[in-house]
């Protein structure tokens, strides 16, 4: 038997939505499998579903508010808050009892995520192009309701019910620098040519 320690350590399964950092209308379902690496850092691999033939579509790092506030301003542009994803009920932990899920999200509500998708599966059935920066929703009226309804039916969950159950979760003040798109401008990756450095190690 081959040991697969990182895979075995992925103890958390989450489902939510991501939007492309430069286009709110492009929202996709994201299935996360996460490791709690340190007290202030989670790392997740992201698939398009929780199925045997699921496509690997990206990664996300999740950090504490304290760690986020310590980041350089330029780095903060890459991060999004999780407050609305938690409070709205959009982010869910399928199969976890409500009490345990509530406790988990009470901690997650103050965290920040940096997400890149490597497969634009909303457009192509192949991982073309370069990784794209993704963001999270931050308010009512932004989410693709058809996408949420389809997700809820498939997973047997109720976003509205989860929203009601999480009404008592306190939302901390959002740290400056996150969710840059809310100010009208954002950042995104792009492919460009550059000179190749032929310097060798020796």
Where does each model-flagged region fall?
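N-terminal domain-onset segments
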Residues: 1-41, 111-202
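An exposed acidic His-Trp-rich patch
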Residues: 50-137, 141
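Extracytoplasmic c-type cytochrome modules immediately beyond a signal peptide or single-pass transmembrane anchor
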Residues: 4-64, 68-69, 77-84, 88-89
């Amino acid at each position: 038997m081959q040991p697969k320690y990182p895979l075995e350590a992925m103890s958390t399964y989450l489902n939510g939505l991501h939007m492309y950092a430069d286009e709110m209308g492009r929202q996709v379902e994201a299935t996360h499998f996460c490791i709690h690496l340190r007290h202030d850092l989670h790392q997740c691999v992201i698939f398009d579903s929780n199925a045997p033939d699921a496509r690997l579509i990206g990664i996300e790092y999740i950090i504490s508010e304290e760690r986020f506030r310590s980041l350089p301003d330029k780095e903060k542009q890459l991060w999004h808050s999780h407050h609305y994803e938690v409070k709205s009920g959009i982010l869910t932990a399928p199969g976890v009892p409500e009490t345990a899920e509530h406790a988990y999200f009470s901690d997650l509500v103050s965290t920040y995520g940096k997400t890149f998708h490597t497969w634009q599966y909303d457009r192509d059935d192949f991982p073309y192009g370069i990784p794209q920066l993704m963001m999270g929703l931050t308010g009512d009226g932004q989410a693709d309701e058809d996408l949420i309804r389809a997700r809820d039916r498939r997973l047997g969950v109720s976003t509205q019910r989860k929203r009601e159950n999480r009404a008592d979760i306190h939302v901390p003040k959002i740290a400056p620098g996150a969710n840059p798109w809310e100010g009208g401008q954002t950042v995104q990756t792009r492919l460009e040519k550059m000179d190749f450095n032929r310097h060798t190690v020796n």
